[in-house]
């Protein structure tokens, strides 16, 4: 039950972010759906982080100990997670990282415009949220 509540909270945070960016009349639509790994969320917490990239800026390869759901707030983010091919995500798109998965590429796809994403990190309390690869 706690797992549902925590994931529901994460979904609500992301839904709120989407509404604040572009209020559209006429209901709801699914913007992201992904199967989740089996985890016990007892003793876990949710942390929401805004990540801003200057034009051309990149993050070093890294991993997260829990589940990360990322939502692009502004610009375009180039990303490679796990075995998936490298992909560009634009404003309003989302991606997911499962526990321990390598996030090999995370960078602003533009050399001239800034980019920003909102990351919801679900992890055990007290764990470092990001570790170098």
State what each model feature region is.
Residues 101-127:
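Ligand-binding loop in jelly-roll beta-barrel domains
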Residues 58-60, 78, 95, 99-108:
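Histidine-centered metal-chelating micro-motifs
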Residues 2-23:
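N-terminal export signals
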Residues 66-83, 93:
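Glycine- and acidic-residue-biased ligand/ion/polar-headgroup-sensing regions
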Residues 57-69:
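A short beta-loop-beta micro-motif enriched in histidine and acidic residues
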Residues 84-100:
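Short acidic-glycine-tyrosine-enriched beta hairpin
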Residues 26-60, 124:
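A short glycine-rich, His/Asp/Glu-containing loop-to-beta-strand
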């Amino acid at each position: 039950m706690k797992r549902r509540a925590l994931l529901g909270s994460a979904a609500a945070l992301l839904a709120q972010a989407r509404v604040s960016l572009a209020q559209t009349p006429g209901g709801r639509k699914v913007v992201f759906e992904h199967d989740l790994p089996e985890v016990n969320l007892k003793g876990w917490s949710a942390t929401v982080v805004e990540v801003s990239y200057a034009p051309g800026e990149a993050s070093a390869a890294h991993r997260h100990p829990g589940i990360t759901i990322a939502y692009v707030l502004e610009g375009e983010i180039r990303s490679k997670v796990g075995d998936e091919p490298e992909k560009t995500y634009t404003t309003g798109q989302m991606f997911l990282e499962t526990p321990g998965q390598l996030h090999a590429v995370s960078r602003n796809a533009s050399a001239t415009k800034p980019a920003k994403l909102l990351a919801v990190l679900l992890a055990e309390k007290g764990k470092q949220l990001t570790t170098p690869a």
